[in-house]
C-alpha cells in the first residue's frame, strides 16, 4: 500500500504536537508536585511563603524568615519535557533538574566561601568563588583567603544530601545553594539552610 507524502507529513505533525502537549502536561504536573514539596519543607523550617509562580518547566517560591535568611527565593528549573529528543540530549550532556536557593542574611560575612560537590558540573565554575581550593570530604572548599575552619559535622551532614553547591558571601545574594532535584530534596534543603549559620559564623 502506497502512502503519499501529505499523509506522512500530517502524521508527523500530529505526533510532534501530541509529544509537545504531553510534555507540557507532564512538566506542569512535575512543577506542581515539586512546589508542594518545597512549600511543605519551607513551612516546616519556619519560613513564611509569600508568593509562588509555576509553568511547565519552572517554579518560583519566595518568602522570608528561613533560618538565617531574612528574604529568600527558591527556583525550580526542569529540563523541558515538550521535546523528548531535546530532553534526552540535555540528560546526556549532564544537565539536571535543579532547585536553586538564593537569600539574604541580616549580618553578611566579611569574606566568602563555597562548597562544590566533587565530580559534578558545579566544580567547573570553582574559580568564580575564589583562588584557594581545599578538599573537605565530598566537596571542594573554595575561598578568597585561608579556608574557614568548618565543623566536621556540617560537612558530614551535607555529604549525605543531593547538594551540589552551597556558597555564603558578602555580596547580595549572600547565600546560594544548588540542589539536584530528587527524593532527597527536603533533607538537602533543610541541611543547606541549617549549614548557613555555621558557615557564616566560621567566616566571622
Language-model segments: what does each one mean?
Residues 188-203:
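Short amphipathic C-terminal alpha-helix that caps PH/PH-like domains
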Residues 7-18, 48-57, 129-130:
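N-terminal short leaders/motifs
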Residues 22, 36-39, 46, 66, ...:
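Intrinsically disordered, low-complexity regions
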Residues 70-191:
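Structured extramembrane domains adjacent to transmembrane segments
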Residues 1-41:
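N-terminal signal-anchor transmembrane alpha helix of single-pass membrane proteins
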Residues 21, 42-43, 158-161:
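Exposed regions on extracellular, virion, or secretory-pathway luminal proteins
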Residues 24-95:
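N-terminal topogenic membrane-targeting module
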Amino acid at each position: 500500500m502506497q502512502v503519499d507524502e501529505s499523509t506522512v507529513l500530517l502524521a508527523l505533525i500530529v505526533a510532534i504536537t501530541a509529544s509537545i502537549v504531553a510534555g507540557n502536561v507532564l512538566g506542569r504536573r512535575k512543577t506542581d508536585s515539586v512546589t508542594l514539596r518545597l512549600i511543605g519543607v519551607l513551612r516546616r523550617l519556619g519560613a513564611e511563603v509569600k508568593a509562588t509562580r509555576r509553568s511547565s518547566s519552572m517554579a518560583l517560591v519566595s518568602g522570608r524568615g528561613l533560618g538565617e535568611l531574612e528574604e529568600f527565593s527558591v527556583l525550580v528549573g526542569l529540563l523541558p519535557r515538550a521535546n523528548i529528543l531535546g530532553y534526552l540530549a540535555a540528560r546526556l550532556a549532564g544537565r539536571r533538574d535543579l532547585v536553586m536557593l538564593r537569600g539574604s542574611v541580616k549580618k553578611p560575612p566579611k569574606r566568602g566561601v563555597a562548597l562544590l560537590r566533587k565530580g559534578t558540573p558545579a566544580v567547573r565554575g570553582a574559580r568564580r568563588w575564589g583562588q584557594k581550593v581545599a578538599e573537605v570530604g565530598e566537596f571542594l572548599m573554595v575561598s578568597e583567603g585561608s579556608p574557614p575552619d568548618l565543623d566536621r559535622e556540617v560537612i558530614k551532614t551535607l555529604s549525605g544530601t543531593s547538594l551540589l553547591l552551597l556558597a555564603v558571601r558578602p555580596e547580595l545574594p549572600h547565600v546560594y545553594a544548588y540542589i539536584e532535584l530528587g527524593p532527597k530534596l527536603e533533607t538537602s534543603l533543610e541541611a543547606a539552610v541549617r549549614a548557613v549559620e555555621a558557615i557564616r559564623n566560621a567566616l566571622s
